[in-house]
């Protein structure tokens, strides 16, 4: 929508959105969860290019659908670059989120002719089926555990963040032992008590629990829009 570079930083907003005053003119676009955004108290839509003037106030209201919203401005947010990234991640960066009253640098754009001014919603909140592939230790599962994974719905527990998601439901307990091995975003680990832990974008890179499933990139994106109490089902692909 904004023709930004893939490395230009966006703002991820979880559950509750901020109130922002723009000190320069620019263009913005909002995707992901619908948090009832307004510009100068006038409702605006997700998945559109919005012209912003100096002094305009952007505010987010009630969360209608989804869990995470993404706000982009033309040219991206100019946060400090650490290890080739503008993301916040303690302890590599001093902050892990924005604080009230902070100022964030953006570039001024008076003129911009977008190739498209709006697009069909790409929101994933209404999907509840998550595609996953068999993980390296999938074969250690017994028939009952496999049956539960394929047929049971799993409710997102309160323990969920950018590092990992957990579910209320469990599968069979096990005593499988393995060496610490590599993990990726989307790796589904199984604890000895039968609890499933799905590593997310800021998840650890190694782990000692069996890696029974691996989510697709789309599966990770779908799960990231789920909040506590939402449910999902796995579709296990060969």
Model region roles, listed by residue range:
Residues 1-238:
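Conserved "landmark" site that anchors the functional core of diverse proteins
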């Amino acid at each position: 929508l904004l023709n930004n570079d893939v490395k230009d930083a966006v703002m991820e907003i979880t559950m509750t959105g901020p109130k922002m005053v723009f000190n320069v003119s620019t263009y913005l676009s909002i995707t992901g969860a619908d948090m009832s955004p307004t510009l100068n108290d006038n409702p605006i839509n997700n998945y559109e290019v919005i012209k912003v003037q100096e002094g305009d106030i952007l505010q987010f209201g009630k969360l209608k659908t989804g869990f995470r919203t993404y706000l982009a401005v033309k040219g991206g947010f100019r946060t400090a670059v650490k290890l080739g990234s503008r993301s916040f991640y303690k302890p590599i960066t001093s902050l892990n989120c924005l604080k009230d009253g902070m100022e964030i640098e953006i570039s001024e754009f008076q003129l911009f002719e977008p190739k498209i001014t709006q697009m069909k919603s790409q929101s994933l909140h209404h999907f509840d089926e998550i595609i996953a592939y068999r993980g390296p230790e999938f074969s250690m599962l017994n028939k009952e555990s496999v049956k539960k994974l394929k047929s049971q719905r799993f409710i997102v527990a309160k323990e969920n963040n950018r590092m990992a998601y957990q579910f209320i439901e469990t599968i069979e307990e096990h005593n499988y032992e393995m060496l610490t091995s590599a993990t990726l975003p989307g790796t589904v680990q199984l604890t000895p008590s039968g609890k499933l832990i799905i590593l997310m974008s800021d998840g650890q890179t190694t782990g000692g629990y069996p890696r029974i499933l691996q989510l697709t990139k789309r599966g990770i994106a779908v799960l990231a829009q789920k909040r506590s109490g939402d449910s999902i089902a796995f579709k296990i692909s060969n």
